[in-house]
């Protein structure tokens, strides 16, 4: 390092006065941190790929499907189907699972002592300090069988196969913070073959310190002061303009709590305001990424109710990416635009895009 500085001084004498030792140390530390992120990512990928695919078998339960439908504030599973509310029976055997609703199955099964400090399950976490997980996006495919979809159905025994596809170290553009992006693939197969291929991208950032009780919060005040129930999205007006469909929604703390419970998701940002605000820096509890994905798919199939069999309105593929958090109590719009492919945006107050998706 000293010889390099001597050469620099010889070639450009004026520069020497501006090169501080602290600057050099910061550069070395920065390089070391980025190297650590790369090393953690490589170790993680090597460990999980050496383990090979992980498999689980589960029966598609009617009760779980009923509760998810009601959590989404939809009284029926499909247009013209019997009501599922107020003591009504659960869907019958062989009823198809709507697109996206598979997310209520194969939920993580861990004791509380095995969870991370933020409540997330650590089943696919890189090593410390990269343990703060966020659902960044992904894609879901519904393969065709003889030209037709092969949906999961109530009562079927389904095999889930999970593979770790990738782990890459990256840098947050706005802050320069290191992070690791992990790609995971989940394949769901019934007796007829593969029904769903679900590829997810998780971002892992460094865990944040828990502030002391005396530390004031820097987050803006909470917006979830209203506990008015979310309106039934199927009865709400879908405004249309040409090939564009818009639905306005608002998620309440109760809806987020029920969705967390149903999907066995203990991530604290979805139900603990002190954690979301004081530790993570959010202004309120955060709407789940999977809940946003389901809401997009629900709007897509609600615009296709003229199909002969509404139970088989299933896309071939959706790609999606979360771009900004949504909060409880915020009214937001899902805007769907038809074309060669269907493009969807979830738009927060102020015109901020929270999620982008494309459906084929």
What are the language-model segments listed below?
Residues 17, 32-54, 137-251, 322-360:
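HotDog/MaoC-like acyl-thioester-processing domains
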């Amino acid at each position: 390092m000293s010889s390099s500085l001597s050469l620099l001084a010889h070639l450009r004498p004026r520069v020497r006065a501006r090169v501080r030792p602290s600057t050099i140390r910061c550069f070395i530390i920065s390089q070391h941190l980025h190297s650590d992120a790369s090393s953690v990512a490589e170790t993680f990928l090597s460990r999980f790929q050496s383990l090979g695919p992980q498999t689980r078998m589960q029966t598609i339960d009617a009760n779980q499907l009923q509760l998810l439908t009601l959590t989404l504030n939809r009284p029926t599973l499909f247009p013209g189907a019997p009501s599922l509310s107020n003591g009504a029976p659960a869907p019958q055997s062989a009823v198809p699972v709507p697109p996206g609703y598979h997310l209520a199955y194969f939920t993580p099964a861990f004791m509380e002592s095995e969870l991370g400090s933020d409540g997330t399950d650590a089943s696919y976490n890189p090593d410390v300090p990269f343990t703060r997980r966020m659902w960044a996006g992904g894609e879901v495919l519904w393969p065709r069988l003889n030209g037709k979809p092969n949906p999961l159905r109530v009562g079927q025994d389904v095999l889930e196969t999970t593979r770790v596809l990738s782990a890459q170290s990256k840098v947050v553009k706005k802050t320069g913070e290191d992070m690791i992006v992990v790609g995971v693939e989940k394949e769901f197969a019934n007796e007829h073959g593969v029904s769903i291929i679900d590829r997810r991208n998780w971002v892992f950032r460094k865990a944040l310190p828990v502030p002391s009780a005396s530390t004031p919060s820097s987050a803006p005040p909470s917006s979830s002061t209203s506990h008015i129930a979310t309106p039934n999205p199927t009865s709400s007006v879908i405004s249309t303009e040409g090939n564009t469909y818009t639905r306005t929604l608002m998620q309440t703390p109760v809806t987020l709590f029920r969705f967390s419970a149903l999907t066995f998701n203990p991530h604290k940002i979805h139900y603990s305001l002190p954690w979301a605000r004081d530790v993570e820096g959010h202004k309120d509890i955060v709407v789940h990424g999977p809940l946003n994905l389901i809401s997009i798919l629900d709007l897509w199939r609600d615009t296709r109710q003229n199909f002969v069999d509404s139970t088989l309105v299933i896309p071939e593929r959706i790609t999606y990416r979360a771009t900004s958090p949504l909060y409880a109590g915020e009214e937001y719009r899902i805007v769907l635009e038809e074309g060669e492919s269907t493009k969807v945006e979830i738009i927060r107050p102020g015109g901020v895009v929270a999620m982008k998706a494309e459906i084929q």
